[in-house]
Amino acid sequence: LPAEDEFAEYEQLQASIGSTKKALRILDANANIEDLEIAANRRKDDLLVYFALGLFDRRAKYSEMPNSLQRDIKVFFRTYQSALAEGRESLFSIASPEVIAVACQSASAILPSSVHDESDQLTFHQKYLELLPPVLRIYVGCASQLFGDLEEVDLIKIHIRSGKVSFMGYDDFETSPLPTLTQRIKVKLRDQDV
């Protein structure tokens, strides 16, 4: 449920209905709240990616985190330790080609545009990165730890079996009917090499 500082109409809602819990019960009884459930699932996925990739940095103390993040941890993971454990488990799961293959199959079904060779690779536009299942976002996130900023990248290719990610940049990708490849960087996750 959203907290007081998470939406502008909180006081108006409180005056007319009473509480966010009561408002949610009314919505649940009278409307389809599927969009709320989808948003909650997306937020949990975002947090999972955050905690998995956060293992590469110094771990922040729970007490130093913003209140909104503390609330989300309580809602989606119950405890900070559980959030860290799920993040760690998700990070380690990217070592399995089977996990990556299943996630690529799932991603190819939901991405607006992609090329998927089931035995070998999934290629997609960088702007669709946030639409990927969490395990693939973590996979690409690990590669970007070695590669750097993805700002100049147009296409990303996930190599399913070999533990590699390719980042490709093109001249005039968005406007040219046949853009020229200007950069292709292949990150070998298993060797931690670019």
Residue ranges and their predicted role:
Residues 1-194:
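Basic, alpha-helical nucleic-acid-binding regions used in initiation and control of genome expression
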